[in-house]
């Protein structure tokens, strides 16, 4: 038996071959699929890491057209709250608005506004046996500023002379009503006066600012969340579904394991319409088995991340480009999207990953340096950095809701009982996420122009690679010159 199967390559080993083109970069379309049922307007996904993705970054990325996967090093309630924050940030019509009953106090309103970062709350009667809520008024933060006592009933300050609209109103008409009446919130009711929804002027403005935002059928930003394989995982999934999550990622270092297959099947059995990403894998056999278990997308990548030490500690893995290509052959048979997770340093790597067969790319370090990431900001020798750590690092695994199960390790009170497969470090701060995304997508569009393709599908089907030498790689980077001013899309520290 031949132990050496084949040579395996990664992004730096190849270049895309330019082709005849009548396509300009600005004419390309970068819309792609995340899962069987979810499309993204840009093929970028943020990693489920505790120094990368929480609500703030997930909101920014969804507004740009991608999607964020909120990490699971959080309590179940907190992770669900993070998802809900994304879902409520921007809506067409808020179908189940946060509300107060008539016997609530002003302090209740203050607490609710602070907890959910909102500025107005409908006031309703206690629900009927059918669960209907009769609208009585609305209280806004302006009303709260006009009162001295927080113990008074909310009915003493709420506005009762309401401007409302009936179900089925379109957003253009709603905007006209808001403008004419100089109000910020339009309450939606049915013929009986029961509360059915809420449209805010702020949401309408947000839609105009980000026309390419990744949204669900109700006009809400899309959000994903990671889950593991612990005993309480289904409780976590229940809470995430209640919060409105669009997709859950069964997130482990080795997706081709029975525990992951069982968890995917369990989730799909209880929530058949919920989209489930499963991973990580590096072989076509793993893709086949996860698809059979019910996965709606498969995440590819064993050890390519900048903070991952799996290939060194365990001696196991697969160079990322070959892993994508091998997995894509199997995924194509069932039309299941692939997510290339890890190893992305530059926008050119995104183009290579997609050309190799991925439908989207998941990135950690690229986004960890943005202002919106939850990592700590560090000032070192006059430069700004952000903390960045692998989910296999000691710090991440030692958290109360830590990631040890991602690496199939038992929870322990002693850090020395963990065998880490990641490190902790810092990366240069990069500024706002939308500026980073602009450069990444600009680079991808440039690649598509060079290759003469208009869509991601054409990029996958109509491109070829050449293998390069170490000398070719050196020639590809700036050489024989001292860089005096770094470009926004190229850094020697990448």
From Swiss-Prot:
Pathway: Purine metabolism; XMP biosynthesis via de novo pathway; XMP from IMP: step 1/1
Cofactor(s) needed by this chain: K(+)
Positions with a binding annotation for IMP: 306, 341-343, 364-365, 388-392, 421
EC number: 1.1.1.205
Annotated residues for binding of K(+): 303, 305, 308, 475-477
Binding annotation for NAD(+): 251, 301-303
GO molecular function terms noted in the UniProt entry: IMP dehydrogenase activity; metal ion binding; nucleotide binding
Highest taxon above the source species: Bacteria
Subunit-structure text: Homotetramer.
Family (UniProt): Belongs to the IMPDH/GMPR family.
Record NCBIfam families: IMP_dehydrog
Record protein name field: Inosine-5'-monophosphate dehydrogenase
Native source species: Chlorobaculum tepidum (strain ATCC 49652 / DSM 12025 / NBRC 103806 / TLS)
Annotated gene: guaB
């Amino acid at each position: 038996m031949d132990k050496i199967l084949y040579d395996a390559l990664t992004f730096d080993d190849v270049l895309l071959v330019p082709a005849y083109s009548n396509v300009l970069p600005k004419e390309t379309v970068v819309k792609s699929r995340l899962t069987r049922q979810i499309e993204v307007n840009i093929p970028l996904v943020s990693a489920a890491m505790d120094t990368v993705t929480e609500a703030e970054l997930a909101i920014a990325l969804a507004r740009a057209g991608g999607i964020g996967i909120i990490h699971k090093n959080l309590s179940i309630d907190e992770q669900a709250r993070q998802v809900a924050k994304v879902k409520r940030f921007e809506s067409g019509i808020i179908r189940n608005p946060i509300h107060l009953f008539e016997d609530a106090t002003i302090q209740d309103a203050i607490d609710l506004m602070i907890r959910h970062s909102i500025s107005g709350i409908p006031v309703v009667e206690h629900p009927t046996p059918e669960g209907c809520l009769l609208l009585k008024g609305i209280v806004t933060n302006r009303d709260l500023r006009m009162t001295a006592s927080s113990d008074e009933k909310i009915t003493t300050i709420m506005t009762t002379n309401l401007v409302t609209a009936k179900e089925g109103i379109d957003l253009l008409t709603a905007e006209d009503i808001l403008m004419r009446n100089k109000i910020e919130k339009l309450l939606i009711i049915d013929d009986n006066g029961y509360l059915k929804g809420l449209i805010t002027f702020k949401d309408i403005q947000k839609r105009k600012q980000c026309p390419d935002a990744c949204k669900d059928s109700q006009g809400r930003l899309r959000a994903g969340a990671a889950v593991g394989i612990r005993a309480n995982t289904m409780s976590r999934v229940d809470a995430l579904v209640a919060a409105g999550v669009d997709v859950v990622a069964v997130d482990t270092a080795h997706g081709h394991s029975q525990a992951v297959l069982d968890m995917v099947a369990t989730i799909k059995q209880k929530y058949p319409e919920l989209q489930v990403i499963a991973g990580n894998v590096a072989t076509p056999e793993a893709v086949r088995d996860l698809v059979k278990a019910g996965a709606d997308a498969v995440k590819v990548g064993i050890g390519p991340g900048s903070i991952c030490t799996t290939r060194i500690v365990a001696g196991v893995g697969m160079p990322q480009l070959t892993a994508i290509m091998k997995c894509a052959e199997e995924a194509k048979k069932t039309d299941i999207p692939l997510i290339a997770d890890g190893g992305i340093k530059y926008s050119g790597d995104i183009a290579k990953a997609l050309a190799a067969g991925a439908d989207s790319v998941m990135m950690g370090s690229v986004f960890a340096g943005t202002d919106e990431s939850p990592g700590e900001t560090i000032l070192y020798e006059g430069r700004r950095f952000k903390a960045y750590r692998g989910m296999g690092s000691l710090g991440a695994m030692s958290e109360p809701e830590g990631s040890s199960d991602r690496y199939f390790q038992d929870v322990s009170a002693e850090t020395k009982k963990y065998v880490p497969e990641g490190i902790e470090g810092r990366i240069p701060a990069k500024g706002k996420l939308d500026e980073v995304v602009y450069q990444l997508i600009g680079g991808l569009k440039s690649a598509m122009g060079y290759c003469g393709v208009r869509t991601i599908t054409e990029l996958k089907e109509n491109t070829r690679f050449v293998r390069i030498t170490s000398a070719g790689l050196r020639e590809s980077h700036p050489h024989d010159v001292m860089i005096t001013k770094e470009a926004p899309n190229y850094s020697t520290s990448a």
